[in-house]
Amino acid sequence: MIRVLHSVSNMDRAGIETMLMNYYRHMDREKVQFDFLCNKTKPGAYDSEIESLGGRIFRTPGLNPIKYPKYLAYMKELFRKYPEYKIVEAHNGALGVYALHAAKLNNIENRIFHAHGASITKDWKLPLKLICKSRLKANINYQYSCGIAAAECYFGKDTVVNGDFELIPNAIEVEKFLFNSDTRNKLRSKYNLKNKHVVGHVGRFMAQKNHTFLLDVFAEYAKTDADARLVLLGDGKLMNSIKSKAKELSIADKILFVGNVGNANEWYSAFDLFVLPSIWEGLPVVGVEAQAADLPCIFSTAVTKEIGLS
């Protein structure tokens, strides 16, 4: 059996992690197994399912550069204890070089960087991320990407022109997202959304997803439509500040914060419109899911045109 070690933040319900689970559930796990190298100590929503499917979950000391020697020692012991690993695939942006460099030092043959974002978040970690990005090519021998824009961001335009990378589509289980009128009626009844015009968004509460702008736009729309409602799925460190902004804009009574739930697929049937105002994306899984539900979609210009499905 081949075991692939995936470096991730943690296995919560987010785009990258959900994409991995979509593949994991449907592959022949007698031949290939996925294991997950998580860089956060917090348990993930998918942990129990992963273990039930035969996967392993490891938790590193984290990606603090001050603790890098400790990280390398952890990885050295992991590879000593589990010598079967021949493939390491990193999904956590430029910081994925941590796992890939450790893999190279321990003579792991196949080291894959999987690009998911078309930009690098400009936060306080930006200098570290840029250093890590500059070290990627020295530590990998395979380049994967969810789309062209993400490939250009991490590998450069020449790599894209020369086709020197593998395009891995963000696949979904289409049947789970098809429109269902019974599901629509159930959710809209439960959450007092009957006869309302429901705008939906699915995404982690972080700067990239641009919730602040979304609320500003919705506040203007709500002035013209008393039945307008905004439903937000997801959680994250900015949720409380977004709730405060909703109160400031006097639209808190028109917004439903659903949280991080296991039935996000059902919510697409309850929406009338899907919006994704992200500042940057690779090829967002939620955009594919919304189109599978036959929803009208509004994407920001930062979202790659590759997202458009016929």
Language-model features, listed with the residues they occupy:
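A short helix/loop element that forms part of the nucleotide-sugar donor recognition site in Leloir-type
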Residues: 75, 178-192
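Aromatic "clamp/platform" in nucleotide-sugar-dependent glycosyltransferases that forms part
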Residues: 260, 279
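N-terminal strand-loop element at the rim of the active site
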Residues: 2, 6-70, 164, 237-238
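Nucleotide-activated donor-binding/catalytic signature segment of Leloir-type glycosyltransferases, i.e.
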Residues: 243-259
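Short His-centered aromatic/hydrophobic patch
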Residues: 90-96, 115
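A conserved mid-protein helix/loop that constitutes part of the nucleotide-sugar donor-binding site
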Residues: 14-22, 197, 201-220, 237-243
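A short, active-site helix/loop in glycosyltransferases that binds the activated sugar's phosphate group
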Residues: 140-179
